[in-house]
Amino acid sequence: MLWVAWKMLIGNRAKYLGIVFGVMFAALLIAQQSSIFCGLMSLTVSQIRDVEGVGIWVMDKNVQFVDDVKPLADTELFRVKGVPGVAWAVRFYKGIARARLEEGSYEQMILLGLDDATLVGAPDGVFMGSIADLRKPDAVIMDEAGYRRIWPNQPYRLGRVFEMNDRRAVLVGLTKASRTFQSFPIIYTRYSQAVLFAPPERKVLSFVLADPEPGVPPEEVCRRIESETGLQAVTRQQFIRKTIRYYLAKTGIPVNFAITVLLGFVVGTAIAGQTFYLFTVENIRQFGALKAMGTSNWTILLMVLSQAVQVGIVGYGVGVGLAATFGYAIARGHSRLSFFMPWQVLVITGVAVFLIVLLASLLSIRKVLIVDPAIVFRG
């Protein structure tokens, strides 16, 4: 009977493709928009992920997310170092600086200052120059995407000079740092150099980066730091979750994407449901003939549901495949649009498609179950 259901389904190619299109459209829109949303959320925490080898972030108690910098006094570093369980702690500067380029134009940049002695927080993807070059006077390293933005269609060249806060900065390296939510070029330099590049402030210490001693849980060290210093201390994963929660709760990004996803679900259900219902009405005599031959209602129900499942599988596969192709094209084209498709997106899309085909089939099931077998013998 399942084979009969399949042959009935593809008998009218136009209606079959119409049902598949409705499901595919919904799957494409849900998967694509959900992946773009996940990509945007990943951008908000990219700089936390890029700082490798750091177990604990210490900051002002009122900081809500990674870009919400509230400077600390430099003496807080020594207070953190004195907390039992802290293996080491270093300074870290994060801020926005305005750079004056060689041709006279200005550009906003994300300025990151690394500890002078250890260079903790330095990027891993340096492909021109080296991290050690940061120890040179006025030295900075820039991310590749930022270089392409400032000097588009120009070859990579070290030694470029620009100014920040009326101070000379020399480009000594390029790195493949992760893109950020703000999309500004990223500048890495030594902490002592960063505070000179930045606008003058009484307090300049953005974060204290620390690591627990071997065998001591990071969460326990965070509690000790908070208890003894009054500062906020979180692990790397806690800081990532805290930042994402802020953007989910305090911005309109989730609502905007949710509306688009809901629209795709409704439109997909409407197209698939209407087309599937018309398909059922067109084949009502065939279902009546099956009933006249003794086919039970349960078998008829199974046939309708199997048709819906087959449409769902095809529509889901094509829709998700097109969404993934869209993401691949974005990655290859160096687009500023972010795209990240974790397995959760595939599961959510699958559940949505299942609900769509279920709702679409429910519109037709009653029509099939109440059909009179005598319809076969009517003109």
Q: Which residue stretches match the model-derived regions?
A:
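C-terminal membrane-exit region of the final transmembrane helix in multipass inner-membrane proteins
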Residues: W3, S338, P342-G379
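Membrane-interface helix starts
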Residues: L9-F25
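Hydrophobic alpha-helical transmembrane segments
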Residues: Y16-V20, I313, W343-V351
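Hydrophobic, regular-secondary-structure patches
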Residues: V20, M24, L28-Q108, M128, ...
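Peri-transmembrane interface segments
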Residues: I36, T44, P218-A270, L278-I284, ...
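A short beta-strand structural signal in non-transmembrane regions
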Residues: I56-M59, Y147, L174-T175, E201-E228, ...
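Hydrophobic secondary-structure segments that place a key small or acidic residue at a functional site
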Residues: F92-G95, E102-A117, P123-Q193
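Transmembrane alpha-helical interface segments in multi-pass membrane proteins
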Residues: G264, Y277, Q286-A331, I348, ...
